[in-house]
Amino acid sequence: MNKPKNPLKNRILTILRLAVYDFKAKYAGSVFGFIWAGIEPIVTVIVYWFVYSVAANFSWSDDCHYYLWLSVGISAWLFISEGIKSMTSAFRDYAYLIKKTGFNKPSVLRIRAISCIFGHIIFLAIVLALCVYENTFSSAWIYLPLWSAAIFLFVYSVGRIFSLICAKFKDMQNIVGIGLNICFWITPVFWRLSQNASFPAGIIKYTPGAVFVNGYRSVLLYGTFDIKALIYIICIDALIFIIGSPMQKRMISDIADG
């Protein structure tokens, strides 16, 4: 006697399989494959470390080594930026699947969002190994999944809005790319923002990017957990998610025609 099928379980497994395929497709044909997910951010860290620590010879006063401080910040930032960029083009990248098979459109967003997690896990594993090597391990690490989940919700919520717009307005991809580049330079990823900074610089510490980057650093490097900052950013995530929900209901039916 055949066991009754579980539609929800089958859908979840399908989304997970397609998310894995989506991640592998990014590195299809390359010699090193998904290893590039770790190589690229490492090279980024080395370049910024060399430019600011060696070439520019700037002063750094912290018990934590600059390369490690930078690595943790970049791990959080790349999760945000790469995730949003990838989400923005989701409907266009999967247009063939939607048009030919009538694939569930909201699932496309979930596939792309989950796919972004894999690359983050690879680089984060390297960062955690460096943290252990530099002896920054503490009990506060148990809160890291909370910050990662908050970033994931932010990426999904923002990416959903951008992907809906991009499905009808292709230039949205370029706009998002430029916007993320600007946000990178004003977010304290490779530079330190004073906690006592006055207006307008003081506003930066309340931006999502700064909150996420500082949240990762506080947990992994300084053994502290700022519950107020996490609650604040979860409220921001929820607000963006709520804004995106009616947009999805209104716009998603026309996606296949884009």
Where are the model-predicted features located?
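Hydrophobic transmembrane alpha-helices and immediately adjacent juxtamembrane helices
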Residues: 1-258
